[in-house]
């Protein structure tokens, strides 16, 4: 891209690219806005909370930036190979308040998969799964059975698409 929005510059992840009238490319990130609407729809307060982000791709960067901006107390990214990984997840069982799944685990057609088992988490208030197909992943289903608030990724998808459409119309 020839020009990047301030969001992209701070997050480091682009998901919307528009070719401008002069032929240059403009990059933006609409997932931040979409994720904010997901939090809003759930009525979730993140300030001071202990947040686990599952996955280390572009979506996780966006979620981390949002959580930092909203004042989350501790933000831990869980990846397959990092310092915080699925093999030592139990060290977060007593602390985590919010889990955000940014991995594809549980997405159609692998609906029998989940990135983790929620049973050990004692202070969990909410599970946000960016997956929207199926509407209720195995992770969401388990959270509901434990009485934990949940939301899938459909709100994020719809809201980021609205913003992307607006950006396309404004920039072209």
Task: Label each PLM-derived region with a short phrase.
Residues 57, 81, 133:
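Residues in the short beta-alpha loop(s) of Rossmann-like NAD(P)-binding domains
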Residues 69-87:
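NAD(P)-binding Rossmann-fold cofactor-contacting core
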Residues 1-41, 146:
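Phosphate/diphosphate ligand-binding glycine-rich loop within oxidoreductases
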Residues 44-50, 122-123:
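Short helix-loop-beta connector
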Residues 37, 41, 65, 69, ...:
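Short, well-ordered alpha-helices that flank and scaffold nucleotide-derived cofactor binding pockets
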Residues 29-32, 39, 48-68, 72:
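Glycine-rich adenosine-cofactor-binding loop
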Residues 37, 149-171:
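Active-site capping/gating segments
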Residues 85-151, 155:
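Rossmann-like adenosine-cofactor binding region
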